[in-house]
Structures are given as structure tokens and as C-alpha cells.
Amino acid sequence: MDCIADLPGVMEVVMVHIVGTNKPASLRSDMVSSARTRIESEATLLNNLGIPSVRTEVMVHESPAAGIDDAANRNNSDIIVMGARGKSIIKGLRLGSVTQKVLHESKKNLLIMRGPIIETLSGEKFQKYCPLIFSRVLVPVDLTTESWTAVEQLAKIPDVQEIIAAFVISRGESEQEIERLKQQAGDELEKKCRQVPTKGAEIRWRILEGDLVTRINDYAQETDVSLVCTVPTEKGFFAEMLHGSFSCELARQATKPVLVIRRP
């Protein structure tokens, strides 16, 4: 809750709890009542932390992911914020099924916070991932216009201090071919970075080599970015995978918060 209150620009929060229809009918009433008591207590906490408007919804729905998306659309929300909450044996490695479904099916922007990180944050680290979550953002791009949507949207946010546009070369038949790709990509990336107007953010680019998802997440860790941002698209290197699978894999493996921006 503290982290939501410290995200920049938050004016209204709608807290949603879904009770699945797979729960025994005899228990649902008590589950709804218990959830409502808990969520209203958390709403009071957010109010006390400075959020101007906090509303709560507890509903019974056959699909938690669809229920969350319905609530977001009904309230005209700009973004859905969720935890990764996977149940992998290795904690934090996998997206929870609800988060994964929202990622695939919703048209809303989605911010996925890594539960194991947020739960242990304190002091300087807490400050990085909450009020300064947009301070240093890594964006995987290719040379298509569609993949630069995230860079253009982030550049409009005053809180963003640095944007790193990362281009990954995942294959090459020879060293000469790789060098040619690097030169071509470098020229295009430099040109595109210069063309994006910002609210003060510095935009720089990097060329990486290796598996797309693995290299992006490794570089995010190496450079200690505050956020990784992506736009699901069917063009460019994303076309080589099932639509949406790149964003899903990126979010699944990430140790950093992941922001998924939907195209208009």
C-alpha cells in the first residue's frame, strides 16, 4: 500500500478484490464480508498516506482477471497495478495466473510490481522502487515505429529522468553480419533518440547481444534500472513470437517492476 501511495501522479485508486465463483457457495458471503473489511482498512491507509480519492469494490466473478479488467473499464482507470505473485517453487520466478491473464487479455496499461522485491523494501531501495520508479527506465526496442511507443509515452512524464532504448541482436550468421547489424542499428537508434521530445529526460541507446528476454532482464539488473517498459506489438522482433509472449516472458523473468503500455 505504501508503494502505491508513493507512485507519482496518483490522484485516485480503486481497490478491487475478486471472490471466485469456484469457491463454495456456502462460504462466499463470509468471504465477501471478510474481504470488504480488509480492503476498506487498506483504503483508509491509502487515504492517510495522501491519496485524494480511494474507492473499493468486492465482487464475485467467475474469472478474477476478467473481473479486474471489468472494474478498470467501468472506472475508466488509466492503469492496472498488480503484483507478480507467482506460485513457482523458486519464489518470484513465475507470473501468477491472474496477472498473466490480465497481461494477455486487458487493453489497459499494466504495472507489474515484483512481490518479493516490494515486500522487503526499506530505506533507499524503497525510495527507488516507489516515488522514483520512473527515474531510470529500460525500454526494449527495434527499428519499427510501433516499438518506440513506450519511449514516446515515457518521454512525456516529468518524473522520468533517463530512458535507455535497448536493441538486442539475437542472431547473426557471422561476425561481419553482426557488425553490419550493429552499425545499421546504431545509426537508426541515434536518429530516433534525437527525434523524441522529452520533459527533461535523457534518452540514450544501447546495443546488446544474446537471447532477447534474457539479455534485457540481465541488462536491467546490471544497470540497476528502476523499471522495464514494453509495448506488445505484432511487428519487428516481436513478430517472431506468439503475440504478447515477449511481454509475458519479460514480466515472468524480470526482477524489476515491469510496465506494459498498450498502443492506442
Residue ranges and their predicted role:
Residues T120-C130:
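A short, basic/flexible loop-to-alpha-helix module at the beginning of a structural domain
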Residues G67, T149-A150, E188, R215:
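Well-ordered alpha-helical segments embedded in enzymatic catalytic cores
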Residues M1-S29, P131-E179, R194-A201, Q253:
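Small/aliphatic-rich secondary-structure junction motif
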Residues S26-L27, L93, S122-G123, A150-V151, ...:
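Short, well-ordered secondary-structure micro-motifs
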Residues V14-V16, R55-M59, L111, I164-A166, ...:
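General small-molecule cofactor/ligand-binding pocket signal
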Residues S29-E40, E179-E190:
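Short, surface-exposed alpha-helical segments at coil->helix boundaries
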Residues A5-D6, A72-S122, Q221-P264:
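Gly/Ser-rich helix-loop-strand patches that form or flank binding pockets
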Residues T44-I80, E119-T120, P197-V228, T233-F238:
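Structural beta-alpha unit
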